[in-house]
């Protein structure tokens, strides 16, 4: 070797240096995990909103009661939710839905902590469909009675009572609106679970 020549020596990169390097671009799996975690957080927030709407509907209907300030010797004019089986069914159904949604919160948290877990999402998907069906049935049945209370039905001689029982009708109408808010949120939850399961 001549004195003017320089020898190049390749030094292998140490494992410590190699471990210190992090990829600048996230892998597809990491991106999918972040997307599913975002869906899980949105699912949890929607459930909180549905709980508020369902319990508000049950409480409003369950406390709806109005007594007119005048009465006769034999009659006292009163309107209450328990006078109608449809409204009683509504209160029971919405209370059950509210209870289910509260119990579903831990499973929703699992989907946030473990975004790739299929079993909790599938369970919530099935139970949300059942809850959606029950809520829709209760809300639709109560809405029919509220419509008759506001407008009556001349063909069957059913008289409108909301001119006399204004506060009662306002409360039951608000309860029905809250139930349909719950329906919309449950529909969103079902669609959300479907998207999350499709991404698997």
From Swiss-Prot:
GO terms for biological process: cell wall organization. Keywords: Cell membrane, Cell wall biogenesis/degradation, Membrane, Transmembrane, Transmembrane helix. The chain crosses the membrane at residues 39-59, 87-107, 122-142, 172-192. Residues 60-86, 143-171 are extracellular. It holds the Pfam family CASP_dom. It is found in: Cell membrane. GO terms for cellular component: plasma membrane. It comes from the Eukaryota. Residues 1-38, 108-121, 193-200 are cytoplasmic. InterPro entries: CASP/CASPL (IPR006459), CASP_dom (IPR006702), CASPL (IPR044173). It is a multi-pass membrane protein. Homodimer and heterodimers. Regulates membrane-cell wall junctions and localized cell wall deposition. Required for establishment of the Casparian strip membrane domain (CSD) and the subsequent formation of Casparian strips, a cell wall modification of the root endodermis that determines an apoplastic barrier between the intraorganismal apoplasm and the extraorganismal apoplasm and prevents lateral diffusion. Belongs to the Casparian strip membrane proteins (CASP) family. PANTHER family: CASP-LIKE PROTEIN, CASP-LIKE PROTEIN 1U1. This is Casparian strip membrane protein 1. It comes from Theobroma cacao (Cacao).
């Amino acid at each position: 070797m001549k004195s003017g020549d320089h020898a190049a020596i390749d030094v292998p990169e140490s494992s410590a240096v190699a471990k210190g390097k992090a990829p600048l671009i996230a892998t597809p799996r990491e991106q999918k995990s972040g997307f599913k975690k975002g869906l899980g957080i949105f699912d949890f927030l929607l459930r909180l909103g549905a709980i508020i709407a369902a319990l508000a509907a049950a409480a409003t209907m369950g406390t709806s009661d109005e007594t007119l300030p005048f009465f006769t010797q034999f009659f006292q004019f009163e309107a209450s939710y328990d006078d109608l089986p449809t409204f009683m069914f509504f209160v029971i159904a919405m209370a059950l839905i509210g209870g289910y949604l509260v119990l579903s919160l831990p499973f929703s948290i699992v989907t946030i902590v473990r975004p790739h877990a299929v079993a909790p999402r599938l369970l919530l998907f099935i139970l949300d469909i059942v809850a959606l069906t029950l809520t829709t049935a209760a809300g639709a049945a109560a809405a029919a009675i509220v419509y008759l209370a506001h407008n009556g039905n001349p063909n069957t001689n059913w008289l409108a009572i909301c001119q006399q029982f204004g506060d009662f009708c306002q409360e039951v109408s608000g309860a029905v609106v809250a139930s349909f808010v719950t329906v919309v949120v449950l529909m969103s939850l079902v669609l959300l679970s479907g998207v999350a399961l499709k991404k698997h």
